Every structure is written in C-alpha cells, then in structure tokens.
Amino acid sequence: MELWPCLAAALLLLLLLVQLSRAAEFYAKVALYCALCFTVSAVASLVCLLRHGGRTVENMSIIGWFVRSFKYFYGLRFEVRDPRRLQEARPCVIVSNHQSILDMMGLMEVLPERCVQIAKRELLFLGPVGLIMYLGGVFFINRQRSSTAMTVMADLGERMVRENLKVWIYPEGTRNDNGDLLPFKKGAFYLAVQAQVPIVPVVYSSFSSFYNTKKKFFTSGTVTVQVLEAIPTSGLTAADVPALVDTCHRAMRTTFLHISKTPQENGATAGSGVQPAQ
C-alpha cells in the first residue's frame, strides 16, 4: 500500500479536526510549537557552533533571530513600551513574570545584548533544546541542591560585573496563568544586591485572551510588554532584600493588572508610547 495516500488522508483528517474542535486546534498548535522548538534548536546549535565554536553569550543573538520568527506562525504581535531601558550598556538583573511555554517568544523579542538566563538543570537534558541553551550561555541551577545553586549564583554575581552581563530571571519560579503574580522568590534580588547592580522589571500582559490551557484555545493576539524603570541597589545589603522584593513585586503587579485590562485581540489599539517589536 502506498504511504503517501495514507499520510495525505491523515493530514486531511487532522485539518478537519482542527476546524471542528477548538481543543484539537489547541493541541495541534502546541505540538507545532514544541516541534519548532526542537527543530530550530538543532539548526541553531549547528549555526552557533560554526559561528562561534562553542558556549558564549554571543550565541543569544543567533537564537533570538530564529525564535522571533515563531510569532508569524501564530499571528502574535508584541507591543513594547520603553525598550531603551533594557539597552543601557551595564550589568543588571532583569526580572519578568512567567506565564507559559510561550514566554520564550516574549523574551527573545526584547532580549538585550550580553544577556543570559537562569534555568532549572533538568532542561539541560532536553535534547537539542538543552544543547542550544548551553551554547547560549544559560546558567543551570539544581533546585534539589541548595548549596550548589548558591555557589552558581555567587559565581554569577562576580561574572556579571567582570564580563558586563545582564541576567534574566523569572522570580515567580514557576509558570503562572491565574491572572495575577505569584509571590517572588528572593534569589534574583540577593544576586542584584551582591553584585550591586540595578534590577530592571519587565512585565508582559496576560496571555489569557488568546492562550488558555484550561479552556483549550490558542488564537492570535497582541502582548503588551512594559519595561519599568530600573531599581537601584547601590549601598543595599542582604537585610534590605525583603523590602526590595516587596517594592518590585508591587510595581510589577500594578503594571500587570493595568496592561492586562487593555484590549489584547487583533486590531486592538495600542496606547501612546508603544513601540512595536521588529
């Protein structure tokens, strides 16, 4: 029996299911996203190795170029407000809210030069995805061993200043799509105080109008990205961290609730001062 007619029939059946079922469309789009991540990771890893020969933060520009194309598959648009606040040539800790697997697209839309991320160690073993993260200079934390994680963070604090690095961290510690922010973990703030570098909060509006895992829908939409003013840490000590966490959380939560109330569907009008990401 010919293979191609079977594949064509399966594809037609899948397309029919997608048209008839919102849940089928959701799962098909998520599957495509995962396939894109693995495929692009493999291709980008090869490009990074050919271009830079190994692990370096410079590979992030290559990774970003690939990932920024994902939004065209899904009809997503990112409206970035005050992006210049991320572009200053200085080390800093960038903190942002963490909603879903789609966060990587939002991150790459505004990722500044010489910026690395912190990720859980399990991702290192995720095939080509782990490889491209390693090549991009991502720092992996073993959450099960707090002493090891603290050692990595201490080393990172020194490297930030020495190598003029920006570090991107999700202080909620886990994905959260409940329409609000979770309490922040303190690691990012201890890191900023240790290195005496500013904290730059980045807030993404809620994805819930176009992406919802509970209701199983995944449509096109617009994400508002607000970069807040940097919070200085010069002269602060570990004793100041709880107040620093509270200040940052309140500012980000207020912004999140505000920008998530604006229309997020296609055709929505952006507010003043909005700069579309290219």
Curated annotation (Swiss-Prot):
This is 1-acyl-sn-glycerol-3-phosphate acyltransferase beta. Changing L228P: In CGL1; reduced 1-acyl-sn-glycerol-3-phosphate acyltransferase activity. Keywords: Acyltransferase, Congenital generalized lipodystrophy, Diabetes mellitus, Disease variant, Endoplasmic reticulum, Lipid biosynthesis, Lipid metabolism, Membrane, Phospholipid biosynthesis, Phospholipid metabolism, Signal, Transferase, Transmembrane, Transmembrane helix. Belongs to the 1-acyl-sn-glycerol-3-phosphate acyltransferase family. It is a multi-pass membrane protein. Pathway: Phospholipid metabolism; CDP-diacylglycerol biosynthesis; CDP-diacylglycerol from sn-glycerol 3-phosphate: step 2/3. Residues 1-23 form the signal peptide. Expressed predominantly in adipose tissue, pancreas and liver. GO terms for cellular component: endoplasmic reticulum; endoplasmic reticulum membrane; plasma membrane; specific granule membrane. A motif (EGTR motif) lies at residues 172-175. The gene is AGPAT2. GO terms for biological process: CDP-diacylglycerol biosynthetic process; epidermis development; phosphatidic acid biosynthetic process; phospholipid metabolic process; positive regulation of cytokine production; positive regulation of cytokine-mediated signaling pathway; response to xenobiotic stimulus; triglyceride biosynthetic process. InterPro entries: AGP_acyltrans (IPR004552), Plipid/glycerol_acylTrfase (IPR002123). Residues 51-121 are cytoplasmic. The keyword Endoplasmic reticulum applies. It comes from Homo sapiens (Human). GO terms for molecular function: 1-acylglycerol-3-phosphate O-acyltransferase activity. It is linked to Lipodystrophy, congenital generalized, 1: A form of congenital generalized lipodystrophy, a metabolic disorder characterized by a near complete absence of adipose tissue, extreme insulin resistance, hypertriglyceridemia, hepatic steatosis and early onset of diabetes. Inheritance is autosomal recessive. It is found in: Endoplasmic reticulum membrane. A motif (HXXXXD motif) lies at residues 98-103. PANTHER family: 1-ACYL-SN-GLYCEROL-3-PHOSPHATE ACYLTRANSFERASE, 1-ACYL-SN-GLYCEROL-3-PHOSPHATE ACYLTRANSFERASE BETA. It catalyses: a 1-acyl-sn-glycero-3-phosphate + an acyl-CoA = a 1,2-diacyl-sn-glycero-3-phosphate + CoA; 1-(9Z-octadecenoyl)-sn-glycero-3-phosphate + (9Z)-octadecenoyl-CoA = 1,2-di-(9Z-octadecenoyl)-sn-glycero-3-phosphate + CoA; 1-(9Z-octadecenoyl)-sn-glycero-3-phosphate + hexadecanoyl-CoA = 1-(9Z)-octadecenoyl-2-hexadecanoyl-sn-glycero-3-phosphate + CoA; heptadecanoyl-CoA + 1-(9Z-octadecenoyl)-sn-glycero-3-phosphate = 1-(9Z)-octadecenoyl-2-heptadecanoyl-sn-glycero-3-phosphate + CoA. Converts 1-acyl-sn-glycerol-3-phosphate (lysophosphatidic acid or LPA) into 1,2-diacyl-sn-glycerol-3-phosphate (phosphatidic acid or PA) by incorporating an acyl moiety at the sn-2 position of the glycerol backbone.
